[in-house]
């Protein structure tokens, strides 16, 4: 009985770092599962802002906020353009006032988008999403060094007078 208790204590002392590590990993996985990835990233960026350079972090947050705001503006613009198209096809006397109001809203939203894009230098991506400006990778260079000349050229084996001088 005493040997079993001693063995358990030894195993527990040796395994405690591994058990703690496994427990921490399980907690991290549960944390990530519980929250969405966007919430986790916002929590992580808020922790970084308290530690790091405030100007750079606020600029990053403003850029991501600008991107989401710009995407919502574009979505509302598309909806207003659809509404404008349906009003133009109707062309009744009652719709004239609504048509003018919707056209003014479309122009205002388009001006906001243009102002936004010029201020933040946001480039539309091929899928219609908006992302940061694209910087192409630098051109590839030859990474292998120039081959050095062989100091000793290879000699053919001397088959006929091998061992004879």
From Swiss-Prot:
GO terms for cellular component: membrane. The keyword Ion transport does not apply. Residues 133-154 have a biased composition (Pro residues). Signal peptide: none annotated. Residues 67-119 form a coiled coil. It is a single-pass membrane protein. Residues 123-156 are annotated as: Disordered. It comes from the Viruses. It is found in: Membrane. The chain crosses the membrane at residues 15-35. Keywords: Coiled coil, Membrane, Transmembrane, Transmembrane helix. This is Uncharacterized protein 084L.
């Amino acid at each position: 009985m005493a040997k079993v208790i001693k063995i358990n204590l030894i195993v527990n002392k040796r395994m405690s770092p591994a058990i703690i590590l496994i427990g921490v990993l399980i907690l991290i996985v549960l944390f990530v599962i519980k929250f969405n990835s966007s919430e986790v990233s916002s929590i992580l960026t808020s922790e970084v802002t308290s530690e790091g350079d405030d100007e750079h972090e606020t600029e990053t947050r403003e850029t991501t906020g600008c991107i989401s705001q710009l995407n919502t503006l574009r979505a509302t613009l598309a909806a207003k353009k659809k509404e404008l198209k349906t009003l133009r096809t109707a062309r009744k006397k009652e719709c004239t006032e609504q048509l003018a109001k919707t056209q003014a809203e479309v122009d205002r939203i388009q001006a906001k988008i243009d102002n936004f894009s010029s201020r933040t230098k946001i480039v539309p991506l091929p899928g219609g999403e908006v992302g940061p400006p694209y910087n192409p990778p630098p051109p590839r260079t030859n990474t292998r060094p120039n081959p050095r000349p062989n100091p000793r050229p290879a000699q053919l084996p001397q088959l006929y007078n091998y061992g004879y001088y």
